[in-house]
Amino acid sequence: MPAAERIGGSVNVPRIPAGTPHRGNPILQRIMIALLRLTGWRFTGTDFPDVPRMVLIVAPHTSNWDFPLGVMAMYALRIRGTYLGKHTLFRFPLGILMRFLGGVPVDRGSSQDVVGQTVAIAQGMDRAIIVLAPEGTRKLAPKWKTGFYRIAQQGGMPIFPVAFDYARKEIRFFPPFHPTGDLEADLAALRANFTPQMARYPAQYA
């Protein structure tokens, strides 16, 4: 995206398509941009997709710091992401904060699997950004979980890969990826965007 279409100076915040789920306000946006600038982070990569629904995957996920960084990024972009959490975590009082930040409870013991629940949640929204960490854990995970892929495939949504590159302090956007149905080939193509050197703790990303 041309520099003239970005805001936030060195933080390089991309313009977001008008139909994207929004949250926050200009004042909070400026505060988050200032925090990103203060800590040396900036946005790089492709445009933000202009699609009704997407599965946004964030990797590498090796640190508790990924969550506050993600919150700062979402408010700097003024987008509303929807993430999933175990339904028991949404009890009072923690549930208030989790819902405020875009959390949606899912019941893993339900007769409807988590993939089905998530697809139903996304299809129940006019526009949705489903945010997932494909590793499913901060610990070393040689293989990615496949739930995000099945959600995208069953929901007819593109996968939008985003890297938290701690080495370069970049929140990097990659081109949207449309599942082909070849799981192994598609996972390999998606994983090629990410390297251990990007991670906060490289030894915890394979």
Task: Write out the residue ranges for each language-model feature.
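Accessible peptide chain termini
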Residues: 1-2, 164
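Extreme N-terminal tail/first-helix region
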Residues: 2-43
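Soluble catalytic domains of membrane acyltransferases
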Residues: 21, 38, 42-196, 201, ...
